[in-house]
């Protein structure tokens, strides 16, 4: 089934400006992106901007505003997809896909023009997409997950165009996994010198939602290590947000390399900030028994912090164990040290020996 390409939607989306902006499309963008019309298939396409008559020599062609063209395009998409589902149910032969090819090629430009002119209530766009999803939820073999992804991306798109601080200059061949990084980069670059925390200009829930929907980090492959500094700078080393974000990313098990690299990054920041073990445990939400049980993924980050801390000076071993026992108690400390085996068997042995010595001093028999 042919669907609007999320990558193309992202490329177009990043180009959008404020919803209420009346500025014309940049000429460079128009030259790079031939999507210069939002007219539906019955009107045709000849490179004339939406809202103008397609053919001045043909008075029968109807003038449409960008918003009207967009709504018509979405209605048309719903109709075609539902018609396709019905045809499959009834065993009808597949219809030619020329109309859907048109929508895939030109539909995004209608969105761009619609959002630039703001001539209709943007909430109507969300309703239209919701309607599309509702009608297709129970239709067989329509790749509803893809539709939901398009829906989520478009909602993110609508939200972002109202935030100039997080827009970026696009490249038409950009892949979806670059979208979150583009927003982060832009937030960092556009932060005023007087604002110590550029993160405030970044819509964290939106970025989280984007990554949840598209698993952007899964596609980063070898690029993650070169982007860690950018990522950290964007949050201005706000380790509370970084830790929360990492816990969410850690649910993407295939991205072990990124998770490990970010844990190292966080640990080094905390060490530079001279954070105590108790402070880091609090940041990660694992300082209490209940919090520890709920945030076991964050405990992995904590173990990495302990390893990095001990590696900087192995003479700190006894003090580290003392603080661990004070913060977590002997049982949870033992569990944390056991997890150290997967990080560094050698460091596990060193800290476990210190732990055994401490337990003997307090009259407790080591395990």
From Swiss-Prot:
Q: Know anything about its domains from the record?
A: Has the canonical EER motif, but lacks the canonical translocation motif RxLR, which characterizes most oomycete effectors identified so far. The EER motif is not required to trigger an RPP5-dependent immune response.
Species of origin reads Hyaloperonospora arabidopsidis (strain Emoy2)
Q: What is its main location?
A: secreted
Q: Where is the composition biased (Basic and acidic residues)?
A: 54-65
Record's keyword annotation contains Secreted? yes
Job of this protein: Secreted effector that acts as an elicitor of hypersensitive response (HR) specifically on plants carrying defense protein RPP5.
Q: Which residues form the signal peptide?
A: 1-16
Superkingdom is: Eukaryota
Span of the annotated motif dEER: 61-64
Compartments reported by the entry: Secreted; Host cell
Glycosylated residues (UniProt): 20
UniProt miscellaneous comment: The ATR5 effector protein is a polymorphic member of the RXLR class and displays copy-number variation among different isolates of H.arabidopsidis.
The terms describing its cellular component in GO are:
extracellular region; host cell
Keyword terms of this UniProt record: Glycoprotein, Secreted, Signal, Virulence
Give the induction text: Expressed in spores as well as during host plant infection.
Q: Which family does it belong to?
A: Belongs to the RxLR effector family.
- What gene is behind this protein? ATR5
The protein's name in its UniProt record: Avirulence protein ATR5
Q: Which parts of the sequence are annotated with region: Disordered? A: 33-65
Keyword match Signal? yes
């Amino acid at each position: 089934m042919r669907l609007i390409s999320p990558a193309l939607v992202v490329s177009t989306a990043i180009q959008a400006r404020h919803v209420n902006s009346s500025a014309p499309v940049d000429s460079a963008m128009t030259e790079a992106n031939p999507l210069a019309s939002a007219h539906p298939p019955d009107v045709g396409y000849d490179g004339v901007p939406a809202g103008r008559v397609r053919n001045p020599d043909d008075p029968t062609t109807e003038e449409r505003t960008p918003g009207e063209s967009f709504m018509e395009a979405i209605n048309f998409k719903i109709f075609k997809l539902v018609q396709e589902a019905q045809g499959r149910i009834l065993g009808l032969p597949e219809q030619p896909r020329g109309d859907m090819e048109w929508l895939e090629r030109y539909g995004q430009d209608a969105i761009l023009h619609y959002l630039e002119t703001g001539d209709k209530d943007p909430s109507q766009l969300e309703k239209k997409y919701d309607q599309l999803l509702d009608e297709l939820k129970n239709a067989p073999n329509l790749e509803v997950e893809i539709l939901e992804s398009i829906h989520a991306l478009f909602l993110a798109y609508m939200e972002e165009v109202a935030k100039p601080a997080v827009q970026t200059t696009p490249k038409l061949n950009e892949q979806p996994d670059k979208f979150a990084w583009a927003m982060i980069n832009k937030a960092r670059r556009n932060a005023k010198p007087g604002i110590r925390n550029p993160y405030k200009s970044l819509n964290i829930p939106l970025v989280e939602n984007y990554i949840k929907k598209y698993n952007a980090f899964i596609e980063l492959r070898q690029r993650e290590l070169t982007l860690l500094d950018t990522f950290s700078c964007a949050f201005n080393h706000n380790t509370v947000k970084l830790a929360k974000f990492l816990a969410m990313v850690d649910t993407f098990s295939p991205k072990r390399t990124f998770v490990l690299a970010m844990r190292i990054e966080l640990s080094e920041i905390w060490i530079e900030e001279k954070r105590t073990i108790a402070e880091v445990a609090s940041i990660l939400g694992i300082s209490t028994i209940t919090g520890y049980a709920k945030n076991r993924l964050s405990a992995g980050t904590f173990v990495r912090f302990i390893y990095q801390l001990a590696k900087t000076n192995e003479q700190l071993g006894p003090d580290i164990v003392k603080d661990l026992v004070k913060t977590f108690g002997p049982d949870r400390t033992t569990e944390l040290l056991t997890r150290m085996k997967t990080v560094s068997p050698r460091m596990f042995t060193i800290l476990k020996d210190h732990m055994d010595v401490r337990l003997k001093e307090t009259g407790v028999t080591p395990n």
